[in-house]
From Swiss-Prot:
Name of the protein: Large ribosomal subunit protein uL10
Keywords of this entry: Ribonucleoprotein, Ribosomal protein, RNA-binding, rRNA-binding
Organism superkingdom: Bacteria
Gene name, Swiss-Prot/TrEMBL: rplJ
Assembly with partners or alone: Part of the ribosomal stalk of the 50S ribosomal subunit. The N-terminus interacts with L11 and the large rRNA to form the base of the stalk. The C-terminus forms an elongated spine to which L12 dimers bind in a sequential fashion forming a multimeric L10(L12)X complex.
Entry's transmembrane regions: none
Its job: Forms part of the ribosomal stalk, playing a central role in the interaction of the ribosome with GTP-bound translation factors.
Organism: Helicobacter pylori (strain Shi470)
Length: 164
């Protein structure tokens, strides 16, 4: 009876992971060996505030969920923490910022963007891109520049006429 209950729990967990992985635009797998529970909880709290999921999952269960969701095949070994979400940039920034502070205990092992495997270097490059809010600010600045220059030009013309 106990084994059947455990098996049912695992089946439900895999089904839940499949639905969450299917909706995710990015999935990162990190080694967290030696990281304290308190620090892992701090990572979870930061991630949750950004809509990013963090979970320690058995490799066999994660492999089944990923395979059935259409992710490229990964060789999962040792201890892994899985982070996934919709914003590739925010997820990459979160992982590399956390990794910077915990070099010895937290390392990115693999990354998947849009269900395709990407290198650690690619994820690091994405982490250096501006986030959505910064991009919107840049775009707004570009859009308002012509009007700003026009108004400045008119003001300079007015000042020149006042001096004459």
């Amino acid at each position: 009876m106990q084994k059947q209950h455990q098996r049912q729990h695992k089946v439900e967990l895999v089904a839940n992971l499949k639905t969450q992985f299917a909706d995710a635009k990015a999935l990162l797998i990190c080694d967290y060996k030696g990281l304290s529970v308190r620090k892992l909880e701090a990572l979870r709290n930061k991630a949750c505030a950004q809509g990013i999921k963090v979970q320690v999952i058995k490799n066999t269960l994660a492999h089944i969920a990923m395979k059935e969701t259409g992710y490229s095949d990964l060789d999962l070994k040792e201890t892994n923490v899985f982070l996934w979400g919709d914003d590739q940039i925010a997820l990459s920034k979160l992982v590399f910022d956390f990794q910077k502070d915990h070099k010895d205990h937290f390392v990115l092992k693999a990354g998947l963007f849009d269900k395709e495997s990407v290198s650690v270097a690619h994820v690091e490059a994405v982490s250096k891109l501006p986030n959505k809010e910064e991009l919107m600010g840049m775009l707004l600045s570009v859009w308002t520049a012509p009007a700003r220059y026009f108004v400045t030009g008119l003001d300079n013309l007015r000042k020149a006429k006042e001096e004459n």
